Amino acid sequence: MATVNYTCPNCAAPLKFNPDKQMFSCEYCMSDFTEKYVQDFFANKEQKENSAEKQEKKEQEKAKENAAKQAQSNDSAQAENKTEEEAVIYNCPSCGAQVVTTASTAATTCFYCQNPVVLGGRLSGEFKPDRVIPFKLSKQKAIDKFLEMCKRKWFLPKNFVSEKHFDKLTGVYFPYWYVDEQRSAQMVAKGEKVRSWTVGDDRYTETKVFELHRAGDLIVNNVFERALKGQDRDMLQCVHPYDLGEAHPFAMSYLSGFQAEKRDIEQNEVAQAVQTRINGYCQQLMKDTASGYSAVQIQNYNDKIELEKWNYTLLPVWVVTYKYRGKILPFAINGQTGKTYGELPTSAGKLLAFAAIIAAALMALGLLGGLLFL
């Protein structure tokens, strides 16, 4: 697997995508580069180096040798190395240190030199995304959003808002499936018009029933499903929506300076759930064309998919998790819009103190009321 380290064309320092400038920036010589310049520069550089395929082949051969050696070890050694086998190890192209990742990680940061590392082969071939929405919210702005939410929480534990939590805030690109469809549909429905009036003490109701026929072309865009297992579903769903008008054709350089995950849920695994949702949307769209009725009940509905397009998309999320009283609490911020989602801990001591203050205030009011009536 090839590791890619995007370096500044001017000084060779690490190059990262800057959400504020929407350009690629070097923190050392303060240079900024457009996405096109970066792509052209590294495309020319890649032609002078060994191809990623050759490197991957070598590592595959090495992995086979290691697997053969591992097979000869005893059961005890296998048990001890189980955790190591589940991880994947690469060498940092900047300092040579070992970078340990999970099987789905596509971009990360070297723990030792803090330089960004992009695992090129993870997002190539069939796993290459169609598009990416770059981070628009910088880490500092994400921290400001986090602090803004914390200020509204009166019962946070003391010293909860600290630098250690800010350090853990990580920008991650998560994979999603997006589907656009065009359908031709026909509907037969029963429409009711109800009219009521009063004459004297009598109340009258008239119900007229109509047979409705509708036909037309329906377009449903941007129906999404997550493409990664093992993550908090609510967290990844609730930071939506994203403005897909700001999506770019995928380029590996956008991952520099952030973490990224490769999909491990395939299109066929979510197709049924997506179709069920689109069916519901389409039927509701057809019902909405029958206006002016008190009630509309579908009698017969059928449609045909005329066009369908799936897009494998990476979306930006700022993520932090923290442990409080043995419970892991996730917090996420939409890296494009700043929308927040998460659960913040509650201090039992502050709750008790607040309850005591309220009780004391009520008791004081009761005593005051009693004195007034003496």
Language-model features: where?
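Short cysteine-rich clusters marking metal-coordination/redox-active sites
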Residues: C8-C11, C26-C29, C92-C95, C110-C113
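Short functional micro-motifs and their immediate structural scaffolds
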Residues: P14-K16, T34, V100, V118
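Charged, low-complexity helical/coil segments in non-catalytic cytosolic or luminal regions
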Residues: F127-K323, I328
